[in-house]
């Protein structure tokens, strides 16, 4: 659940509407982070990403070799090779698109993406990825002039939940 971890780190750290001095910002801070391993996202959010009206910059992470060292050959290639082919194909599809007379099958392309490719998922490569993304989050916070190290936005929900559990709905509604 690496995407979920990055989601928590990034969105909780930089999802702010005020800067370090408490002044409202007039620019977007903190991207929306989501993802799924392998091809799990293909029948959910990939549809929106390929043909939706919002253009969402994407970042893929992939590995050349299976993390377990052995792999099953299915229809002439390993599952790892199929995953690598799929990530490469998705990047081409997002970038280039495909014209079709049937507008339901038309893909505009021009959708930005990047990829980080490693040899194999190991403790060392996972640590490198974590360091990469944690530093990205920290530097984005510096650039946006937000405090990436407080999470005041989650406190209100916790406070209100306690009031609701205590059947103090009047206080919950006034908070």
Where are each of the predicted segments found?
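A SIS-like phosphosugar-recognition module
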Residues: 1-175
């Amino acid at each position: 659940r690496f995407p979920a971890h990055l989601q928590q780190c990034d969105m909780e750290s930089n999802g702010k509407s005020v800067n370090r001095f408490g002044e409202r910002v007039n620019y977007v801070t903190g991207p929306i982070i989501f993802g799924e391993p392998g091809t799990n996202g293909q029948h959910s959010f990939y549809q929106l990403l390929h043909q939706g009206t919002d253009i969402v910059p994407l970042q893929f992470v992939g590995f050349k070799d299976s993390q377990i060292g052995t792999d099953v050959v299915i229809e002439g290639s390993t599952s790892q090779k199929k995953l690598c082919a799929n990530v490469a194909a998705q990047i081409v599809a997002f970038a280039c698109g495909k014209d079709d007379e049937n507008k339901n099958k038309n893909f505009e392309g021009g959708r930005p993406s990047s990829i980080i490719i490693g040899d194999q998922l190991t403790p060392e490569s996972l640590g490198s990825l974590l360091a990469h993304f944690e530093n990205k989050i920290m530097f984005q916070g510096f650039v946006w002039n937000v405090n990436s190290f407080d999470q005041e936005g989650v406190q209100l929900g916790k406070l209100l939940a306690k009031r609701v559990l205590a059947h103090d709905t009047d206080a919950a509604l006034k908070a």
